[in-house]
Structure formats: C-alpha cells, structure tokens
Amino acid sequence: MTKIFCDIADIKLVRKFDKKKLVKGFTTNPSLMRRAGAKDYAKYSKEIIKITRKPVSCEVFADDIKNMILQGKKISKWGKNVYVKVPVINSKGKFMGKVIKSLNNRKIKLNITAVYTAKQTKQILKAINRKTKVIISIFAGRMADTGNDPIPRFKESIRISKKYKNVQILWASTREPYNYLQAKKLRCHI
C-alpha cells in the first residue's frame, strides 16, 4: 500500500492531520517553516515532533559536507521518529554521498530529497547500508513541470531498490490527486 505523508509545517495542520489514520507521516523543509512563521528552526521542529509519533522529516539547511553532517547529527537527536532530510546534491551540484554515508553509518534515519534520476538513486544505494531506514524522495511534480515523464524514473528506482528492505521511495512534489493513483500503481511506498 502506498502511504500518504503530509508536506507541511503549520502546527495547527500537523495537529489536524496527525489525527487522520490515512496520514502516516510528515515532511518539512526550511521554506515551509518560514511560511508557517517559525523564527527558531530547531524549536519549531521539536514542537512538531512532540505532536506526533509518526515519522517526521526535518531538513538540514547547510550546503557543505561538514556542516550538513553536524546538523544531521543534531537533528537526529530531536526524537525517535525523526528522519534527517538531506538533499542528494548541494547548490553546487555535488553529490552528497559523504553526508549520506556518514549519517547512515551512525544509524541515523534519512530522507534523501530532491532526487530526479535513477542514476541518483543508484548513487544513494551505493552510499547506504541495508539496515538503517532511508526514504528516497523523487521530485515527480517538478520533473513533470519541465515536460519530463517521471514514471520511467520511478519504475527504475523502485526496481533497483527492491533488495533494500530499509529503503522506501517517496513520490515527492505532488501536484494533483491523480499523482497518488500513479504512485500506487507503481507500488511506490509513499
């Protein structure tokens, strides 16, 4: 079954959707936090984490390897349900394999975000172990916005990650309800 995660940061909405059995987790990011009025990222994130026992992905905002690792270690301590959200590449286009490997080897649950290709999924799979939980968030909506069909990339990413019982593929950047049906048909995890 394809699970539904809410990509929100508004405290009232987190409370509301946490009560819904249909919702199985939450993802956030610094932009959503700012829009929700967060002044202190850590404090606001911890408030969200207190509301729910469901998985919550909180993103690092550093752009370099050293600081991403430091932030990831701090964020992981905010709660047992926390996934540290790390971009697959930084703003310079560099693959963040060292960050992924370092945090994953510390048994820190990860949500690798802004993934666009099956090649990136392969790189991620090479960087992780087969025990610590990892979500790979593939940006379907943004791909479709540029005229690219995300379906083949999802099929390939799901196929190559099948041997990794600790990995879940997330249909990210959802644009319309039909995207859920597409994800479900592909047996996308989230």
Where are the regions that the model predicts?
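Active-site beta->alpha loop and helix N-cap motifs at the rims of alpha/beta catalytic domains
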Residues: 2, 8-15, 19-102, 106, ...
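Catalytic alpha/beta core domains of metabolic enzymes, predominantly
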Residues: 108-190
